[in-house]
């Protein structure tokens, strides 16, 4: 059950990552038009997430998840049949709704299938599948662009739709619903008030997604800088990625033992240190001298996302878990959009300013979150 959810999230994010690469080449339009069309996806995901979360608390979560996967499959395939900007805009906006459906139900089902004693570790796996799928999706998109020339690019969307279809068929076959909808309507199921409990983690959570959005500008910033991608640099970046993947599992498990928010704050301070040191060392191109400081700090940074997701699942309970997990899509969409905008501006000042801006956003958010946690 949990393994399927990892695979489903991984495959779905591969699809979305590849579409991000395909879209600018598929649409014959000015850059700003393509940007607007791309923005429709996170906007519709953010707007639709809360209604979908509430629906997940009142309707079969498995069926809703399958509906989301079917929608993604149909919409992705449909884009391959048209290059009309209006049609593609509508289809891409609807894809945001289907993405919210798949993401919210996946998190809700994962929360249902886990307990306080293992939820952090499981959410670490979810975060790893999510980010790993996106990263691999960018590579898959690049491969599809090379395999299919311009006139055959529709086939790339149909191949991507096939990935979504496979994930949907797996859901219908293997997905088990830990909590039935009739159980949620029983009088003994307590309706928890989660507003005051969820508020303290929001500042760090939003800051984290904004920083992630700014990271989307790093490939261009690296290309514009004088930093050479030597063998040593690639090894350094590879170790960073491996440590982040390992840390998501390790710190998720640690949070099962000593508490979510404590691990989250420690991870946020680790990320702050990484942003400052890496940004400071980039202009002189001597960041490899500090690799034994940068690696452990980036390792700590991997603690933030899984502990927040586990914390939300902990405090929401069965009855409101769908509504609470809707915040995932809302915060992620808003944060990525803001991060893309800020990153676009600061990247022109130099690659180091992406990291300085991230630190400038993260530090006050840590202070606010820590203050709110102490006042609870």
Question: What are the functions of these language-model segments?
Answer:
Residues 10, 87-101, 289-303:
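Hydrophobic core of transmembrane alpha-helices in multi-pass small-molecule transporters
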Residues 70-83, 270-284:
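C-terminal ends and interior cores of transmembrane alpha-helices
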